[in-house]
């Protein structure tokens, strides 16, 4: 266990990875749904807490959605960083790992998280939105998380 970086370094890595991926992911969601105001996209995240009434809450529920989104991304980043410490191969083969991690995150979000919320986001079964979501999660979530983890923890392990 002498190889394990200090907890502070792991937390900082997860923080940076989560913030970057969170910003890229929510920006992509807003840009891919320009037919809806950004407020509505953020409120769709808050439906996990409030159900459909999140859409009636104005900017207060949009802020709740944004904060929730970043908390989710920080959790996802913490899991990835922990896995990368356990399996250093994730740092050495970070590009392959980023594709796999983005796909895993997309699958969990599409088939577990979104269905149990009251979000009006299209279901993952529709082909183009599913492909678009998968690509977005690979590029906006998997890639930055893997890159930051490799960069901050080192790939020589």
Regions found by a protein language model. Name each.
Residues 22-26, 102-112:
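Aromatic-anchored segments of alpha-helical transmembrane domains
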């Amino acid at each position: 266990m002498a190889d394990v970086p200090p907890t502070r370094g792991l937390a900082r890595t997860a923080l940076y990875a989560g913030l970057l991926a969170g910003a890229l992911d929510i920006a992509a969601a807003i840009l891919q749904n320009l037919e809806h105001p950004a407020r509505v996209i953020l409120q769709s995240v808050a439906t996990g807490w409030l159900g459909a009434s999140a859409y009636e809450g104005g900017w207060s529920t949009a802020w709740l959605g944004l904060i929730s989104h970043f908390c989710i991304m920080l959790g996802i980043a913490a899991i990835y960083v922990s896995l990368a410490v356990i399996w250093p191969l994730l740092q050495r083969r970070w590009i392959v790992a980023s594709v796999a991690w983005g796909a895993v995150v997309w699958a969990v979000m599409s088939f577990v998280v979104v269905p149990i919320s009251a979000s009006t986001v299209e279901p993952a079964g529709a082909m183009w939105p599913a492909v678009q979501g998968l690509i977005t999660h690979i590029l906006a979530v998997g890639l930055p998380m893997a890159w930051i983890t490799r960069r901050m923890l080192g790939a020589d392990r």
